[in-house]
């Protein structure tokens, strides 16, 4: 269901996504045409932040594109989970066997962010909002729809994230937008554990044609999941994401 002003989140619900890209202008062309996004510069970046643009759908924020400053870093989409206290959540991540990759650190007046890795190495973000609560729209074509963790050990993943985000995953009325599945269900068994960000599309086959025309690639052709029909693609710079028919 389409949702506007999606700003009230339980801790552990995905509230934002960004793509680390070597070429932001190319990213704007690709995603602007694929999803109908428009873009605006973020003008309160601090000295530690790379050039960043915010993507909008019908004038509401839906994602960000961030320029990579180190070519050794992956070109990747990252999902951020809402938290009211990034420092406390970072402590719980470490106590559960995960690691902090960066932060927590303040991101201008927008909030506090951090990057973490779970015990199997899958990287995810934390977002403690201030001026920027997260998605303004989701669950509609062109917006965030789901995040799937592909992992080698689903029982261990369920235990780790269940301890971190119990209310979001298992509490009354839980609607987490976040699932777990074995890597080998979709990808080669040797692929590292990772989160796959899903964007909703009205017509998956048409979207796949647009991806190919824009220089992207189909990584996994359409298949059925418990949450809908999915195809895995990558943009023209190599960042992978999924299209979810809805």
Predicted features by range, described:
Residues 1-9, 13-22, 52-55, 68-92, 96-149, 171-182, 186-187, ...:
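Vicinal oxygen chelate
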Residues 139-144, 154-155, 164, 192:
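Short gly/pro-enriched beta-turn/loop segments at secondary-structure junctions
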Residues 3, 37-74, 119, 123-130, ...:
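Conserved short beta-strand elements that form part of the metal-binding/catalytic scaffold
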Residues 27, 43, 47, 73, ...:
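Residues in flexible loops and secondary-structure boundaries
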Residues 29, 91, 119:
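Short alpha-helical basic/polar micro-motif
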Residues 2-60, 95, 103-111, 149-179, ...:
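Core segments of cupin and vicinal oxygen chelate
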């Amino acid at each position: 269901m389409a949702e506007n002003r999606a700003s009230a989140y339980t801790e552990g619900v995905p509230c934002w996504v960004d793509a680390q890209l070597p070429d932001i202008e190319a990213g704007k062309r690709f995603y602007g045409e694929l999803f109908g996004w428009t873009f605006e510069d973020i003008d309160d970046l601090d000295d530690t932040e790379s050039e960043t643009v915010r993507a909008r759908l019908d004038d509401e924020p839906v994602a960000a594109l961030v320029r990579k400053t180190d070519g050794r870093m992956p070109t990747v989409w990252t999902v951020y989970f809402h938290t009211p206290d990034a420092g406390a959540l970072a402590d719980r991540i470490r106590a559960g066997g995960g690691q902090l990759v960066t932060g927590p650190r303040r991101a201008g007046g927008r909030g506090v962010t951090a990057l973490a890795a779970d015990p199997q190495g899958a990287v995810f973000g934390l977002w403690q909002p201030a001026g920027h609560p997260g998605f303004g729209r989701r669950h509609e074509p062109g917006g965030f729809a789901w995040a799937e963790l592909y992992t080698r050990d689903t029982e261990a993943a369920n235990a780790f994230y269940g301890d971190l985000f119990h209310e979001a995953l298992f509490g009354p009325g839980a609607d987490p937008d976040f699932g777990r599945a074995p890597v080998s269900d979709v990808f080669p068994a040797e692929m590292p554990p990772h989160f796959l960000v899903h964007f909703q599309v009205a017509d998956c086959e048409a979207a796949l044609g647009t991806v190919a025309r824009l220089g992207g690639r189909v990584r996994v052709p359409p298949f059925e999941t418990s949450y809908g029909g999915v195809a895995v693609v990558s943009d023209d710079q190599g960042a992978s994401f999924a299209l979810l028919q809805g």
